[in-house]
Amino acid sequence: MGARYNSDMASSNDYLVYILDLLQEVPLIHYRKMMGEYLLYQDNVLFGGLYDNRFLVKTTPSLAEEGLKQMLPYPGAKPMYLIDAEDKTEVARLVMKVVNDLR
């Protein structure tokens, strides 16, 4: 479960474009830039964000069984799950599990 934070750079616009491409199979995605990072929403549900060029989503019961690595988005924050899949269908499946838990 080793949650760690070890970076001090903001997320790049290129990384945002890459992640938005990965999220094409998830409907109603939008984002908000905040303090050099990006918050990600699905139909107005905040489910995660981009932190130091890492795609992190909130920890929810449905994702606990997925074996995802936990990381800190920034010092003092709660751990979040790192999404490192590159398959759009798999990314959509994981994101919708989080969103459904948060609704």
Language model segments and positions:
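Charge-dense, helix-prone N-terminal extensions
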Residues: 1-103
